Amino acid sequence: MKTEVLPYTPLMKTIWPQRTLSRDLLLILVGSLFVALTAQIALPLPFTPVPITGQTLGVLLVGAALGSRLGFLALLAYLLEGAMGLPVFAGGTGGIAKILGPTGGFLLAFPLAAGLVGLLVERFGLDRGFFGTLLAMLLGNALLYLVGLPWLAAWLMG
């Protein structure tokens, strides 16, 4: 397979540098399962239908650890698992209705946020220190809000 030349390498490419299809598929599956597990850490809020969950941290960590391409694909797999009805979303829920509901914008932004954090790691090495990691995570979180909040507002108004 073709090798990528990146200024920095994400954690998984350092730990497991040999790139094969089976490795990539396994990392995508593990990444999606990690986010599914972190989604079960949920704190419902009385004033909004969107709970605070651990899955946001999971999304950002998957992006940082797997890189832009595998991070994006892992979160795309996560959305497909949930759309098929597997109980991977917050509160052990799944289904297309969840994606079309108030949390849908946040869910749809997950692959983008993981891809962005992975890109920041690959291009600028922002996972090499505390402040770089903080910046990458804040930018990924900002992207989640940029997509998720307008969706939530439209859902609440409509």
Q: Which ranges hold each PLM region?
A:
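Hydrophobic alpha-helical transmembrane segments
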Residues: 25-30, 57-61, 71-77, 103, ...
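Interfacial helix-loop-helix junctions of multi-pass membrane proteins
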Residues: 86-92, 150-158
